[in-house]
Regions:
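Alpha-helical transmembrane bundle of multi-pass membrane proteins
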Residues: 2-245, 249-251, 265, 271-505
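Short intracellular "coupling" helices and adjacent cytoplasmic loop segments at the cytosolic face
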Residues: 252-263
Length: 505
């Protein structure tokens, strides 16, 4: 779900020197931003039921709470260029870690639905900042030989974060005995506050959803402390005319002095290419075509229905006949785990089979999953009693859909968006596509329960299944195959006026 910043082309010089341990520490620490991203996206799925029960709110208000983080992320993405330029990549990640921590605590202590909505919007700003800047930092600081692997680790950490959020939700909703802990903590807080507020605090801390949302502050603090030990991006240092400091950083990270000097020369050469951004968008029709394609790809990714599952899986499982909280939560964990495992299918085959064949397969699998789920609701789950066979078929349909998404649209949409923009407008293009992703994400998040209540579960899932069929036609007509094609070749064909589907092979 976050933008992949493509590494620069391979150097003609042979790889030299051993990869240093600090490189992996840099990769892991920065990838914690992906973990936090996944945690914040996934945690609301299990918290929704408890928030709705404790605040006594309707489905429309739940949609507002879910989508608030996503609108905040749109705002964060739009701010990310400003902050990453002014504060540096490292400084912006530190800022996002602070906002993650503070926002998580504010969400946990929310006294009302309105406060929680605002707190989640604030938290979403951190998600948007991290989603843009963390991959950028990794792409700029990692030695060229391991750059792709470290960015892939960031992407993987997002899916792991979602699973951990589902597991955390399951623990706090089903197995944790919160009342004794709430009593002890509230007594401590009351003592510090002069004996006031113990009953109120105890009531707060006994609510599972507050722990679900608040526990995310811990990895945020860990990321903040880890980032304090890391250097700034050498590319940003060169941009700020601090070349000697950039070389010092590269020496810490590179295997040899020669490798450090070569990377510095490549950075200086790449910065000679002026980023024209919006000016290029206004002036060049062919660049506008690439922007519209990138925006369209992000809308397609979200309208497959993936985040319907990620945000509302327990509710879907409840509609499918899984009545207990434990059943709903463990079903959600299963979905998240499959999402992680199926991502490796794309990693293994994207450069062997190509982008479009995998996407055609993915849309077919996703469409089959959604259509079968809709049919199951119509045939066996809507309007009354049913046996558990239909319920298990429903969760099997969810798993089929998740496999289709994780092996295709999940990673490959981002790969395509990283490849189709010309170098002079790449930053602008990635910003537009990332902001669109979060906007479409928010629209999905704030409409699903309304669709469920208005159209019914069966028709809602049939609609998403039909959309996946339409997306096959869109890919046939508009999307290029970029496997094995250099970025320079794609740019030349695009700016030369070739049809979009022909700018690749």
């Amino acid at each position: 779900m976050s933008a992949v910043i493509p590494p620069s082309g391979p150097s003609s010089a042979p790889p030299a020197g051993k990869i240093k341990a600090i490189v992996y520490f840099v990769g892991f620490t920065a990838a914690l931003a992906g973990l936090l991203f996944g945690l914040d996206v996934g945690v609301i799925s299990g918290a929704n039921e408890f928030i709705q029960r404790d605040f006594k709110i309707d489905d429309a208000r739940v949609e507002q709470i879910v989508s608030a983080l996503l609108w905040g992320a749109v705002f964060g993405v739009l701010l990310s260029g400003f902050f990453s330029l002014r504060l540096g990549r490292r400084g912006t990640i530190l800022l996002s870690a602070l906002v993650f921590a503070v926002g998580s605590v504010l969400c946990a202590l929310s006294p009302s639905p309105g406060f929680l909505t605002v707190a989640r919007f604030f938290l979403g700003i951190a998600v948007g900042l991290a989603a843009f800047v963390a991959p950028l930092y990794l792409s700029e600081i990692a030695p060229q030989r391991v750059r792709g692997a470290l960015i892939a680790m960031y992407q993987l950490m997002i899916t792991i974060g979602i699973v951990l959020a589902f597991l955390s939700d399951t623990f706090f909703s089903t197995y944790a005995d919160l009342e004794p802990l709430a009593t002890k903590l509230s007594e401590s807080v009351s003592t510090l506050a002069g004996g006031r507020g113990q009953m109120v605090m105890e009531g707060y801390l006994a609510m599972p959803w507050r722990w679900m949302l608040g526990i995310i502050a811990l990895p945020a603090i860990l990321m903040f402390l880890g980032m304090l030990l890391l250097p700034e991006s050498p590319r940003w240092l060169v941009l700020k005319r601090r070349g000697p400091k950039a070389l010092e950083v590269l020496r810490r990270l590179a295997g040899t002095e020669q490798e450090a000097e070569r990377e510095l020369a490549e950075i200086e050469a790449s910065l000679q290419i002026e980023q024209k951004g919006f000016a290029l968008f206004r002036q060049n029709r062919n660049f506008r075509r690439a922007i519209f394609l990138g925006v369209g790809l992000q809308v397609i990714q979200q309208f497959t229905g993936i985040n319907v599952i990620m945000y509302y899986a327990p509710r879907i499982l409840q509609e499918a006949g899984f009545d207990t909280t434990a059943q709903q939560m463990w079903g959600t964990v299963l979905v998240g785990t499959i999402n992680v495992l199926a991502t490796f299918i794309a990693i293994a085959f994207v450069d062997r089979l190509g982008r479009k064949p995998i996407m055609y397969t993915g849309f077919t699998v996703m469409g089959a999953g959604m259509l079968s789920l809709g049919a199951i609701f119509h045939l066996g789950l809507d309007g009354g009693a049913h046996d558990m066979t239909m319920s298990y078929l429903a969760i099997a349909s969810l798993v089929i859909f998740i496999i289709g998404f994780a092996m295709s649209a999940g990673p490959i949409i981002w790969i395509l968006c990283a490849e189709i923009f010309p170098l002079a407008g790449r930053d602008f293009g990635i910003t537009c596509s990332t902001a669109t992703n979060w906007t479409a994400n928010a629209i999905v998040g704030m409409t699903f329960l309304t669709m469920l209540n208005t159209l019914g579960p069966g028709n809602t899932f049939l609609l998403y299944g039909a959309l996946n069929a339409v997306f096959i036609v869109v890919f046939l007509a508009l999307v290029p195959e970029t496997k094995g094609v250099s970025l320079e070749s794609i740019e030349k064909k695009l700016l030369g006026g070739a049809r979009l589907r022909e700018i690749g092979k």
